[in-house]
């Protein structure tokens, strides 16, 4: 992050001290039971972002934020002033501050965001939907392609998003794939092919992978795609209309008809998918917020060329956080990744120390981004609209919670794991196999603390006898394959120990996701984290009982698959045996379930079964003896 240095532990920066032009980012450290929050730390520094009770970061903040919480740096031995509403928690929970010096407020803001994401400190505002939503990426190549990704990288590509709703992303991606002939099937970076694909034959690709695309014509398509993704549709429609008229003037009627169809598809999409405002309003974002007790909803609307392109909504559940802290956390997390940025952002109420955020937005956008709180006029009415919708979303959330009667263990689970909100959706993962073969990845889903069996899933794995590789493959495919559009869980539970948990963490990292993750080892019923921390709870603990139920459901989901396979295999074998008709097949399936158990059954036992004869039993044993071992 460009940090210039780290001050020694326990040192007290003198009043007004510091390197000129630098900003310090502080990290509160957790205290052992009974210790008070002091300047300087009694415990060892944590070796990693794990939740080590001897040195866990409990809060991260830039210099301005810490000044607001503690007023002035205290003298040696003085207690730090707690944040509003957190005095008792801080008195129980901290031993000191670490400082990292950065070059300016913008670097401090970036570092603060990264520290919060890495450590998820207890006293910072953590957004409920703090996950990597998908972006559309226009690659940085001579012949770019459009990809769906979950991580923004500094690679020169153009990113558009985030898209909180997978349906909206699919619709815009499908529209672009259908109307604009960007390459689609030649990989990233582009690989040369011998023959063009079917998209070229359908007129949906210019086939640069076989050298058929004219670079200038391809860049023209790229420019049009950028216009769609940035919401500049009106200008694009005018340009296409001029091209249509020019094609008709040259008597190129087929080309003119193609452009006409393209224009009609764009008009239909943007008239039904978006609400139109005044086109003179241009590009801007506006926000609304509503709150009831600990629960708050923040919503951001993106307006481009006078149309609402999308809405992003976040739920925060934190009793002690102020409205200003919640809004600041939303702005920080959203604008560190969102792209492209508008020239104007309308805020529902003033915030202190917005200069650093404005400077960060300026650097990201390459131009000034104004942060404004309008008091009257059309823009003030936009804020009223946003607040009204945020209030409706909050009321809906409260009614849903009341109606569904959340499981009491969810609050215990939130407190136990330090989650930002009650984990509504849980997913449990299990690896099972049939006699060392046919490994299966099983998914169980709980919502509100109760099984949602219609969303249980299973998948056959390619990994061999390596349980860790199997877990990594299963988790990666859950978030990148055919199941990627399912809702993201608030917590993952792995059936296994630290090895399986770390394999799952690697898969999440490869998929560009950051999700809370724990494992539950069999037998000892011990919770484990990717960092190797073990948490032993009494069997009567409600959170542990809920996780055991989830783990067992995932395991049973896998067993049901293997039982079904055994029955299918047995049915296949029985079909070809003389004297074994439908009734006898059904009897044997119900009694033995699988081929292995049937092979081990004695001849006399088979002959005594209702409806079986000695001759039929002998024919059955002879046929089973010829069957290859399972």
Curated annotation (Swiss-Prot):
It is found in: Cytoplasm. One of its GO terms (cellular component) is cytoplasm. InterPro entries: GIY-YIG_endonuc, GIY-YIG_endonuc_sf, Hlx-hairpin-Hlx_DNA-bd_motif, RuvA_2-like, UVR_dom, UVR_dom_sf, UvrABC_protein_C, UvrC. Residues 75-91 have a biased composition (Basic and acidic residues). Residues 9-28 have a biased composition (Low complexity). Residues 1-96 are annotated as: Disordered. Its main location: cytoplasm. Residues 234-269 form the UVR domain. It holds the Pfam family UvrC_RNaseH. One of its GO terms (biological process) is SOS response. The keyword rRNA-binding does not apply. It comes from the Bacteria. Keywords: Cytoplasm, DNA damage, DNA excision, DNA repair, Excision nuclease, SOS response. Residues 52-125 form the GIY-YIG domain. GO terms for molecular function: DNA binding; excinuclease ABC activity. Belongs to the UvrC family. Interacts with UvrB in an incision complex. The UvrABC repair system catalyzes the recognition and processing of DNA lesions. UvrC both incises the 5' and 3' sides of the lesion. The N-terminal half is responsible for the 3' incision and the C-terminal half is responsible for the 5' incision. This is UvrABC system protein C. It comes from Thermus thermophilus (strain ATCC BAA-163 / DSM 7039 / HB27).
